């Protein structure tokens, strides 16, 4: 008799995705981040669900309801901080996951890569709307600044912004709809994750060498289940250290001041994981130009398969491309730092140079260096 996990319609799906899935024998810990992102999503959905039971999406009571969760709800404080810092862990894993894909040429699997970009946009939208919900100063002004960017769209811009606001400013209607969408989007993300995995399992995983590994596969369980469990343990430990020892390390103190439309904070800035994009937005003096640069800073990832000029897939054996890649990482860290600084000299010029370098590296330098490497290898 066939094992139930191989014959039962539902168990067969799980078996083919998590147990008997053939995986390359040489994938490193950089391949752990997919499962870590799944765990992050699960943590966020569960903590978010319990927070939603006590939260009220009304401008008069939203801030107070978050205080109530932290003070009066049993273990409400840990739920709130797990959710807030869980988002940070989510983005750390996301950036490392995307970075891995860039380094090892995983973007050659175009469908998987494009669904991944959609996922990145969806997670960013969810995180932005979630940041508005506590209704602190940074929530309110962050929402005002970012939604206002849409007014840069010619002709329909102003109408579009007022339609999203549900009025003439960020107010009760905006908060209510943001809560509704913040609740809805993680389930859309979950559906996209299934599509992402579906496309991945069509082709099989890439590996550090970038060479097809069809002739050398091992079952996912027990080899990679145990490896993923180690990664999960390290990530959960890091999250708990953050939550239990310095829960406000990555937050903004201004968000402990209730939202006040009559008082603008001295420095409006988003959460740390958006700072690189915020720096690119600010480095262009023109509003529409800034918005386009902001969108393109993420959308440029969709061009990666077209910009791949190397005869090799992975950067493992390409030292010059590795230099370009790490220069890109350093540039993104610089942009993240600049995004958190006030708009004054010398930060303005540093931000502008870092923004130019970002697009220059991806669109010009990396493809050129790949061509040079091909010639060096006489290909």
Swiss-Prot record:
The record ties this protein, via Pfam families, to: Cytochrom_B_C, Cytochrome_B
Q: Gene3D superfamilies under this entry?
A: Cytochrome Bc1 Complex, Chain C (1.20.810.10)
GO CC annotations, alphabetized: mitochondrial inner membrane; respiratory chain complex III
The protein's topology relative to the membrane is: Multi-pass membrane protein
Positions contributing to a ubiquinone binding:
201
Ligand binding (heme b b562): 83, 182
* Function of the molecule: Component of the ubiquinol-cytochrome c reductase complex (complex III or cytochrome b-c1 complex) that is part of the mitochondrial respiratory chain. The b-c1 complex mediates electron transfer from ubiquinol to cytochrome c. Contributes to the generation of a proton gradient across the mitochondrial membrane that is then used for ATP synthesis.
Q: Which family does it belong to?
A: Belongs to the cytochrome b family.
| Cofactor requirement | heme b
Task: Output the SUPFAM superfamilies linked to this UniProt entry.
Answer: a domain/subunit of cytochrome bc1 complex (Ubiquinol-cytochrome c reductase) (SSF81648), Transmembrane di-heme cytochromes (SSF81342)
Q: Which GO terms describe its biological process?
A: mitochondrial electron transport, ubiquinol to cytochrome c
What interactions and quaternary structure are annotated?
The cytochrome bc1 complex contains 11 subunits: 3 respiratory subunits (MT-CYB, CYC1 and UQCRFS1), 2 core proteins (UQCRC1 and UQCRC2) and 6 low-molecular weight proteins (UQCRH/QCR6, UQCRB/QCR7, UQCRQ/QCR8, UQCR10/QCR9, UQCR11/QCR10 and a cleavage product of UQCRFS1). This cytochrome bc1 complex then forms a dimer.
Q: What's the miscellaneous note? A: Heme 1 (or BL or b562) is low-potential and absorbs at about 562 nm, and heme 2 (or BH or b566) is high-potential and absorbs at about 566 nm.
Q: Which UniProt keywords apply?
A: Electron transport, Heme, Iron, Membrane, Metal-binding, Mitochondrion, Mitochondrion inner membrane, Respiratory chain, Transmembrane, Transmembrane helix, Transport, Ubiquinone
> Entry cofactor note text?
Binds 2 heme b groups non-covalently.
Entry binding sites for heme b b566: 97, 196
Please name the InterPro entries in this protein's record: Cyt_b/b6_C (IPR005798), Cyt_b/b6_C_sf (IPR036150), Cyt_b/b6_N (IPR005797), Cytb/b6-like_sf (IPR027387), Cytochrome_b (IPR030689), Cytochrome_b_C_euk/bac (IPR048260), Cytochrome_b_N_euk/bac (IPR048259), Di-haem_cyt_TM (IPR016174)
Q: What is the protein name for this chain?
A: Cytochrome b
GO terms, molecular function: metal ion binding; ubiquinol-cytochrome-c reductase activity
